Amino acid sequence: MVNAPLAAPLTSPYTRPVADTSPGIDDEAQQLFTAGRYYATRRTAEGLRQAIERLERAVALKPDFAAAWAELADCYALLNWFIEPPPPEAWQRAKHAALSAVSADPLLAEAHASLGFVRLHYDRNWKDAEHELRKAIVLNARNLVSHRWYAYSLSAMGRHEEAITEIERAREISPQSPVIATAVANVLFLAGRFDDAIRQCHKALALDPGGVAAHTILRWAYEKKGMVPEALAAFEQERVFAGETPTTRAKRAHVLAATGHLEQAREILADIISERSEKWVTAYEIAIIYSLLNDRDNAFFWLHTADQEHAVGFTFARVDPHLDNLRSDPRFGELLRSTNQS
């Protein structure tokens, strides 16, 4: 087993403030926590696995180690972005860890942020998510993650101006963070402000030219603007930095459908669905592609699948511009009501 540097500088743009070491924390538990955070900042599948292994050992040694529980909750939650397919128990374990963090230290901002994140994406309990994220900000107003997740929760609820204000607060705290710059672009895109999103993506990419998420949001905005050459070029940049994966292939089908290359998109989509058991792609992306192809029946089938699988993108179905083709269909309103999004 390769050991992480126990005092490695945490300079990743994803790093969030964390409570100072408490005098009573067991030395070994503290070392495991520090190593776990080091691996977690890598934001890769293997990094998250390594982080979880160490954080689980830390809380086993010190069951009231709130900061370790909060970090563990985030790692389990993030498996839903970085593992394909996500482990089916990831969200349940994230929820257990977040609740354990709050129980261990009700005044730890990170604990409430972690629980708010679970309430948003797993429980889809908007009221509780907002309560937890706002409490996290009250406890630590400089916690970037709390501001970012709260902004996303506001976007998901359709409260776009509030979301923009909230994410701008994060940018004021860390103006050079490419993660926050990308989050600003994402919030603008969800608000339908595509020109502003394009400008913001370029700012984010100036900070981190390899930021896959910024390239993705830039492509989305170009698609919505009907800027076909630009959208296709943005996808090629995505592909360069993300590599050839099943998700990248789905993104290819997405951009082809959005730019009018319908038959090519259908061919790729058929392969994606037939091979999904071996080459997993989130059901939410499949639903979006069907929406772009104006195949409503299949789009709704896959949206229901996304709900059942707790696909993270489904949290934003209410406001996602990719689903605009479906909004006039009565089934869309029924779907939102049945999933607590109306």
Model-derived features: positions:
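Acidic, proline/glycine-rich low-complexity intrinsically disordered segments
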Residues: 1-218, 222, 227-243, 247, ...
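Helix-coil-helix junctions within alpha-helical repeat/solenoid scaffolds
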Residues: 210, 214-300
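TPR/TPR-like (Sel1-like) alpha-helical repeat modules
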Residues: 240-242, 304-311, 340
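TPR/TPR-like alpha-solenoid helical repeat scaffolds
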Residues: 248-260, 314-330
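Substrate-binding/catalytic groove segments of enzymes
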Residues: 296-300, 309-315
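Beta/coil-rich, acidic/histidine-enriched accessory regions frequently appended to metallopeptidases
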Residues: 330-342
